[in-house]
Amino acid sequence: MRVILLGAPGAGKGTQAKFITEKFGIPQVSTGDMLRAAVKAETELGLKAKSVMDSGGLVSDDLIIGLIKDRLAQPDCANGVLFDGFPRTIPQAEALLKAGLEIDHVLEIAVDDEEIVKRMSGRRVHEGSGRIYHTIFNPPKVECIDDVTGEPLLQRKDDVEETVRHRLSVYHAQTKPLVEFYSKLEAKDGKPKCSHIPGVGSVEEITAKVLEALK
């Protein structure tokens, strides 16, 4: 079973990805991890990618597809794979299709933008321990102070509202169109199966919907 998991930053993809990989015994494959592994192993594709990255360029979709083919040939992918962060764009999805790499399921975890902004911009972190609080959902006893050490809490740069809104706009421009792309493919060819899952409610409720969609 090959699964693509889509959703805006902050939609809760990480939690559901962990559930899917454990439940179905398939690896989570990210292009970043593949690139690093190929470069470290000094494979032919890894050396090509390193040359491009060292010169400040972007690794081409063709090169990424080559890495994916190599990765899918490994024994742990025999039962399937969960794609993490790929494809991100229509050209990448088309390249995947052209390479004959079939996808069985496309899951979109859908959460309203304002809910995501509320979730992410409210996060506060204790740098020393990594403890995470939230101004609304899990506030510290004293505002902006760690419960255990009494030290100040920080807001990560990625969680600043302006940054969150920028990342959401990039997602809507580049990755959201993939939902329509794969839905049209499903209507035409009968696969991949596309499922739209509301990412609100408890983790358990969302997980149950994910499991139902993958049956």
Curated annotation (Swiss-Prot):
TM ranges: none
UniProt-annotated stretches for the region LID: 122-159
Enzyme Commission identifier(s): 2.7.4.3
GO MF, any single term: ATP binding
Sequence segments annotated as region (NMP): 30-59
InterPro entries, per database record: Adenyl_kin_sub, Adenylat/UMP-CMP_kin, Adenylat_kinase_CS, Adenylate_kinase_lid-dom, P-loop_NTPase
Principal cellular location given in the protein's record: cytoplasm
Keywords from the named record: ATP-binding, Cytoplasm, Kinase, Nucleotide biosynthesis, Nucleotide-binding, Transferase
Key word Transcription present: no
Gene3D superfamilies according to UniProt: P-loop containing nucleotide triphosphate hydrolases
Broadest EC class assigned to this enzyme: transferase
Protein residues bound to ATP: 10-15, 123, 132-133, 201
Pathway the protein contributes to: Purine metabolism; AMP biosynthesis via salvage pathway; AMP from ADP: step 1/1
Annotated positions binding AMP: 31, 36, 57-59, 85-88, 92, 156, 167
UniProt xrefs under Pfam families: ADK, ADK_lid
Protein's GO biological process: AMP salvage
SUPFAM superfamilies according to UniProt: P-loop containing nucleoside triphosphate hydrolases (SSF52540)
GO cellular component entries: cytoplasm
Swiss-Prot/TrEMBL catalytic activity: AMP + ATP = 2 ADP
Keyword Transferase: yes
NCBIfam families documented for this protein: adk (TIGR01351), PRK00279.1-1 (NF001379), PRK00279.1-2 (NF001380), PRK00279.1-3 (NF001381), PRK14527.1 (NF011100)
Function: Catalyzes the reversible transfer of the terminal phosphate group between ATP and AMP. Plays an important role in cellular energy homeostasis and in adenine nucleotide metabolism.
Family: Belongs to the adenylate kinase family.
Subunit text: Monomer.
Domain notes: Consists of three domains, a large central CORE domain and two small peripheral domains, NMPbind and LID, which undergo movements during catalysis. The LID domain closes over the site of phosphoryl transfer upon ATP binding. Assembling and dissambling the active center during each catalytic cycle provides an effective means to prevent ATP hydrolysis.
Record-given protein name: Adenylate kinase
Biological source species: Pseudomonas savastanoi pv. phaseolicola (strain 1448A / Race 6) (Pseudomonas syringae pv. phaseolicola (strain 1448A / Race 6))
Phylogenetic lineage: Bacteria, Pseudomonadati, Pseudomonadota, Gammaproteobacteria, Pseudomonadales
Gene: adk
